[in-house]
């Protein structure tokens, strides 16, 4: 179902989009679902908050697009950018976490360490990667009320633009490391079990980019501790494709328990998400994240999934179902990506906040995060 596309919820974004004029028309999908469980709209007298999560594989252009966006909008009290917590990853939470991750995968690929040894390091490192997102989500959650939709919904008093959602470190990158052989499926599901409930108004922007161009962009950028790992690039691209398909599968009525028997344990190529697919056909379960977990390690002797792992897949379905999904085409200039993102905000869903002081507290929280852990 379309998420009330066309409402100008973010006037600052809307003004910038109008000023930028048309680009080549490559925008993204409208949201594929409007959260049905947000009947409690909150106090209509309280202001609204818009949260935009820019996510997807590393190197696709997320940070560049966000920087272009913030530059176009200029300094504002009502829009705050929440960057990746690089200082936490590299200094505060542990020393050189990214270097440790890439070196561990490299050593595994060269046969210098076993898969079990790599999994211990990767699981520990992924805890470090996920901590800032999980903590921030927890302190933000009490301020988020019900979704504010309809013609009476006021423009947001505050917009937060996040560089990644918690699912990046609690789902997508663990799953990619599993595909790379450096994390167990049990460890991936342990992270999934820790995914926080999805708050109303979660606007998730994923992206598509041809793989050759993606590899070229990744080779050109300089990030502390990063190696150019084309196998990992392929794995994380696949996981994000599966994520988009899974959200659409759930929102179009797919039920993983009913379809589980269709899985054979042999993974097929995953269709890329279509940026224009706003209300298409039901994806196959074979093309979703659920297919990754039809593996012997998770199955009882009779071939059924152990109940404990099935419960975790129920958690996965519960967390992904309410998300408002957008897909941005990054195969254009940074300005083109920025303008496409600006146009998308008209269809995004804000929420009421829960107290009169919430906007000020949220703004302070976001700025504290950026100042304390958002360095390079």
Swiss-Prot record:
Substrate binds at residues 102, 126, 223. GO terms for biological process: DNA biosynthetic process; TMP biosynthetic process. One of its GO terms (molecular function) is thymidine kinase activity. Pfam families: Herpes_TK (PF00693). InterPro entries: Herpes_TK, P-loop_NTPase. The active site is at 84 (proton acceptor). Gene3D superfamilies: P-loop containing nucleotide triphosphate hydrolases. ATP binds at residues 56-63, 217. It catalyses: thymidine + ATP = dTMP + ADP + H(+). Keywords: ATP-binding, DNA synthesis, Early protein, Kinase, Nucleotide-binding, Transferase. Residues 1-45 are annotated as: Disordered. It is an enzyme of class 2 (transferase). Phosphorylates and thereby activates certain drugs like acyclovir (ACV), valacyclovir, and famciclovir to a toxic form, that leads to successful suppression of the infection, while the uninfected cell does not have this ability because it lacks TK. Mutations in thymidine kinase may induce HSV resistance to antiviral therapies in immunocompromised patients. The most frequently observed resistant strains are unable to express TK and are avirulent in animal models of disease. Catalyzes the transfer of the gamma-phospho group of ATP to thymidine to generate dTMP in the salvage pathway of pyrimidine synthesis. The dTMP serves as a substrate for DNA polymerase during viral DNA replication. Allows the virus to be reactivated and to grow in non-proliferative cells lacking a high concentration of phosphorylated nucleic acid precursors. Homodimer. Belongs to the herpesviridae thymidine kinase family. This is Thymidine kinase. It comes from Human herpesvirus 2 (strain HG52) (HHV-2).
């Amino acid at each position: 179902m379309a998420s009330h596309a066309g409402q100008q919820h973010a006037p600052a974004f809307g003004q910038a989009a109008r000023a930028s004029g048309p680009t080549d028309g490559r925008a993204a999908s409208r949201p594929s679902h409007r959260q049905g469980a947000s009947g409690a709209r909150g106090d209509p007298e309280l202001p609204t908050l818009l949260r935009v999560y820019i996510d997807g594989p590393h190197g696709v252009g997320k940070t560049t697009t966000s920087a272009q966006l913030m530059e176009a909008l200029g300094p504002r009290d009502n829009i705050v950018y929440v960057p990746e917590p690089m200082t936490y990853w590299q200094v505060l939470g542990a020393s050189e976490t990214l270097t440790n991750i890439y070196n561990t995968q490299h050593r595994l690929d060269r046969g210098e360490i076993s898969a079990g040894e790599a999994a211990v390091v990767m699981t520990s490192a992924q805890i470090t990667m996920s901590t800032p997102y999980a903590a921030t989500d927890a302190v933000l959650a009490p301020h988020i009320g019900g979704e504010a939709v309809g013609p009476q919904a006021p423009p947001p008093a505050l917009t937060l633009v996040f560089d990644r959602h918690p699912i990046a470190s609690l789902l997508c990158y663990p799953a990619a490391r599993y595909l790379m052989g450096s994390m167990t499926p049990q460890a991936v599901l342990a992270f999934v079990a820790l995914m926080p409930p999805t708050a109303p108004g979660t606007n998730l922007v994923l992206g598509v980019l041809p793989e050759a161009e993606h590899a070229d962009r990744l080779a050109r950028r300089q990030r502390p501790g990063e190696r150019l790992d084309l196998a990992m690039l392929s794995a994380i691209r696949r996981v994000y494709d599966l994520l988009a398909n899974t959200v659409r599968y759930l929102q179009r009525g797919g039920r993983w328990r009913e379809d589980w028997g269709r899985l054979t344990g042999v993974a097929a190529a995953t269709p890329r998400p279509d940026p224009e697919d706003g209300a298409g056909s039901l994806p196959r379960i074979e093309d979703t994240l659920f297919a990754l977990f039809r593996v012997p390690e998770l199955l009882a002797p009779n071939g059924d999934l152990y109940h404990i792992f099935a419960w975790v897949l129920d958690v996965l379905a519960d967390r992904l179902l309410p998300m408002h999904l957008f897909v941005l085409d990054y195969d254009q200039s940074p300005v083109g990506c920025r303008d496409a993102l600006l146009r998308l905000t008209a269809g995004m869903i804000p929420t009421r906040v829960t107290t009169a002081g919430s906007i000020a507290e949220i703004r302070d929280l976001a700025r504290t995060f950026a100042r304390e852990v958002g360095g390079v």
